[in-house]
């Protein structure tokens, strides 16, 4: 595979995984849970 394709897939995977975690972390800090 092309290195650029692998890099894009990696960034997309990281974004999908860290997105909900960041929102969850911010919710905890704000005490909205």
UniProtKB/Swiss-Prot annotation:
Annotated Pfam families: PSII_Ycf12 (PF05969)
Top-rank lineage group of the source organism: Eukaryota
Main localisation: plastid
Where is the protein situated, by its record's location annotation?
A: Plastid, Chloroplast thylakoid membrane
What processes in GO biological process is this protein linked to? photosynthesis
| InterPro entries per record | PSII_Ycf12_core-subunit (IPR010284)
Q: How does it sit in the membrane?
A: Single-pass membrane protein
Q: Which UniProt keywords apply?
A: Chloroplast, Membrane, Photosynthesis, Photosystem II, Plastid, Thylakoid, Transmembrane, Transmembrane helix
According to the UniProt record, one GO cellular component term is:
photosystem II
Transmembrane spans: 5-25
* Stored NCBIfam families: PRK13686.1
Q: What does this protein do?
A: A core subunit of photosystem II (PSII), probably helps stabilize the reaction center.
What is the annotated quaternary arrangement, including any partners? PSII is composed of 1 copy each of membrane proteins PsbA, PsbB, PsbC, PsbD, PsbE, PsbF, PsbH, PsbI, PsbJ, PsbK, PsbL, PsbM, PsbT, PsbX, PsbY, PsbZ, Psb30/Ycf12, peripheral proteins of the oxygen-evolving complex and a large number of cofactors. It forms dimeric complexes.
Q: Which family does it belong to?
A: Belongs to the Psb30/Ycf12 family.
Q: What is this protein called?
A: Photosystem II reaction center protein Psb30
Organism for this UniProt entry? Welwitschia mirabilis (Tree tumbo)
């Amino acid at each position: 595979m092309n290195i650029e394709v692998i890099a894009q897939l990696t960034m997309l995977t990281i974004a999908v995984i860290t997105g909900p975690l960041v929102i969850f972390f911010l919710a905890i800090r704000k005490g909205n849970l």
